[in-house]
Amino acid sequence: MQAQIMNKIFEIFSKNNPKPQTELIYKNDFTLLVAVILSARATDISVNLATKHLFETYNTPEKFLELGEEGLKKYIKSIGLFNSKAKNIIALCQILIKNYQTSIPNNFKELVKLPGVGRKTANVVLNCLFAMPTMAVDTHVFRVSKRIGLAKGNTAAIVEKELLQIIDEKWLTYAHHWLILHGRYICKARKPGCNICPIKEYCEYYINTFSS
């Protein structure tokens, strides 16, 4: 995709939603990290429902250790992979207290050392908490970026690299939020809403599918 077209796409995203934010609901830095871990293979809606009451009482690593693994499971049992997620989160709390004085690390290498934190989770945390220009590639970002022509890769890691190369730095702080929201509400997997899409004239899928 040409840089000029890429810029047109993100100009439209920026005009329609200047400062998009994560739809995960959280109380502080720690609860955002927990929410992002829980969101793996789960929807933000399901995570928010599970954490609504959890975060009201338990919102620090110390309080999570008081709750314990079995106690945590009771709150998050509606979320996929809740057993392994509970185990990882409790282990993560111990490490945060011991090594980081309960603070969340602000660099990628330290974050991915934490239990339950992979590349995507680390990138989300760095972006949302520290405003770093990272590119967290989830299923929405992966699908949308390939469909509209921003990337061609067949893995999340390759797509991430492609997006960081093509997207102008001025857009990167919000780029993954725009792509996620576009995929969640307009460019859906099974039935993309091309009729309401604000960027369709620049989208490779739309041009190839509907242009005569």
From Swiss-Prot:
Record key words, sorted: 4Fe-4S, DNA damage, DNA repair, DNA-binding, Glycosidase, Hydrolase, Iron, Iron-sulfur, Lyase, Metal-binding
Tagged with keyword Aminoacyl-tRNA synthetase: no
Coiled-coil ranges (or none): none
Family annotation (InterPro entries): DNA_glycosylase, Endonuclease-III-like_CS2, Endonuclease3_FeS-loop_motif, Endouclease-III_FeS-bd_BS, HhH-GPD_domain, HhH_base_excis_C, HhH_motif, Nth
GO molecular function: 4 iron, 4 sulfur cluster binding; class I DNA-(apurinic or apyrimidinic site) endonuclease activity; DNA binding; DNA N-glycosylase activity; metal ion binding
Segments forming domain HhH: 108-127
One Pfam family cited in the UniProt record for this chain: HhH-GPD
Family annotation (HAMAP family): Nth (MF_00942)
Family of this protein: Belongs to the Nth/MutY family.
Name of the featured protein: Endonuclease III
The organism of origin for this protein: Rickettsia prowazekii (strain Madrid E)
Origin organism lineage: Bacteria, Pseudomonadati, Pseudomonadota, Alphaproteobacteria, Rickettsiales
